[in-house]
UniProtKB/Swiss-Prot annotation:
SUPFAM superfamilies: YhbC-like, C-terminal domain, YhbC-like, N-terminal domain. This is Ribosome maturation factor RimP. Its main location: cytoplasm. Belongs to the RimP family. One of its GO terms (biological process) is translation. InterPro entries: Ribosome_maturation_RimP, RimP_C, RimP_C_sf, RimP_N, RimP_N_sf. It comes from Actinobacillus pleuropneumoniae serotype 5b (strain L20). GO terms for cellular component: cytosol. The keyword Secreted does not apply. Keywords: Cytoplasm, Ribosome biogenesis. Pfam families: DUF150_C, RimP_N. The keyword Cytoplasm applies. The lineage of its organism: Bacteria, Pseudomonadati, Pseudomonadota, Gammaproteobacteria, Pasteurellales. Required for maturation of 30S ribosomal subunits.
Amino acid sequence: MATLEQKLEELVSDTIESMGFELVGIECQRAGRFLTVRLYIDKEGGVTIDDCSDVSRQVSAILDVEDPIADKYNLEVSSPGLDRPLFTLAHYQRFIGQEIVIHLRIPMFDRRKWQGKLESVEGDLITLTVDNETRQFAFGNIQKANLVPVFNF
């Protein structure tokens, strides 16, 4: 059975791509009775507020017609930001060499949160260097992952 995120991606990805954007990913977060649907978009050269607004209008129209969400919800459209979320294996592949933080579904060595340098992606295994040790994580066990912003002053 498809998740809500997968259903939404099927509904809106073609429209977003036809507008010249990459749909980086979708997050659905519940807070009490309300649901926040967050779409991350990107394009070469970055995303502006006007871009987010345009995509939001188009996606809202699709969701109004298709009505895939039974509950009340807020739609947010944004750029991935400095702490860009990683949703797919291709995202991990793209950012090899970068510092990332991952949150696991099932703890490994009594830890759910790991931060380290992304070394490789082989099949569905993600390899990080954490505290000078190599650790491998199954992609399916990663609940959430983000780039760690680097500030050079």
